[in-house]
């Protein structure tokens, strides 16, 4: 059996100091296996987005340990975290965060081009293949501002895969979409997980969306109540 993809041990996140301090995460323990497809459920304010930010190395915990792919990350410096994030983690957000004046292809290859400092022919080939995979080959040269909401989110999915990550963190990826578009995005995530073995942790309020995941974990008041 392979080693876990992610191990979280007694994770605490506190904002502020002294009497005004707010503890958002309260001693979380969590393990994600390679290739898992997991829903993270919980009400607003329960700590879901904070947990995803820490798992994505966008935020440091106050206490606890985070190990991913066997590498301890809590004591890594910013340069090491950026390198690790670019190589191993993809992101899909509720707001797509596409650059409106970039084409669908330019947005897709942005993570690779930014990391390297320039885009290559290989980047364009991979970006084109990813857009074809998400059903947008005919929108490759459209500006993001000209795409529908569902199309923008599919570009965001393609972008999250550009660097072939082992883990994609999706924070309410269907939250701004109608039911049909939400189902199309989830169809993509399910197929990518099945075909590539990419692990997904999907934060959602929607029990219907969560039901399509192979495992559900729940947060309440900064704690995992069902992991």
PLM segments and residue spans:
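ABC family nucleotide-binding domain
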Residues: 4-212, 216-219
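Conserved switch/coupling elements of ABC/ABC-like ATPase nucleotide-binding domains
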Residues: 221-227
């Amino acid at each position: 059996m392979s080693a876990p993809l992610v191990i979280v041990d007694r994770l605490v996140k506190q904002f502020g100091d002294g009497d005004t301090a707010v503890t958002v995460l309260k001693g979380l323990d969590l393990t994600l296996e390679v290739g898992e497809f997991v829903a993270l459920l919980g009400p607003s304010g329960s700590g879901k987005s904070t947990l995803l930010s820490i798992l994505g190395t966008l935020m440091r915990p106050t206490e606890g340990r985070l190990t991913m792919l066997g590498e301890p990350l809590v004591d890594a410096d910013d340069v090491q975290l950026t390198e690790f994030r670019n190589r191993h983690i993809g992101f899909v957000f509720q707001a797509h965060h596409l650059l409106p004046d970039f084409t669908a292809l330019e947005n897709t290859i942005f993570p690779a081009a930014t990391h390297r400092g320039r885009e290559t022919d290989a980047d364009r080939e991979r970006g084109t293949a990813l857009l074809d995979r998400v059903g947008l080959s005919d929108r490759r040269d459209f500006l993001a501002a000209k795409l529908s909401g569902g199309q923008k989110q599919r570009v965001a999915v393609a972008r999250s895969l550009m660097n072939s990550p082992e883990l994609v963190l999706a924070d309410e990826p269907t939250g701004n979409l109608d039911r049909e578009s939400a189902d199309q995005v989830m169809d993509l995530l399910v197929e990518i997980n099945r075909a590539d073995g990419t692990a997904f942790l999907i934060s959602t309020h929607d029990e219907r969306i969560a039901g399509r995941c192979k495992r559900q974990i729940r947060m309440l008041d900064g704690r995992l109540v069902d992991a």
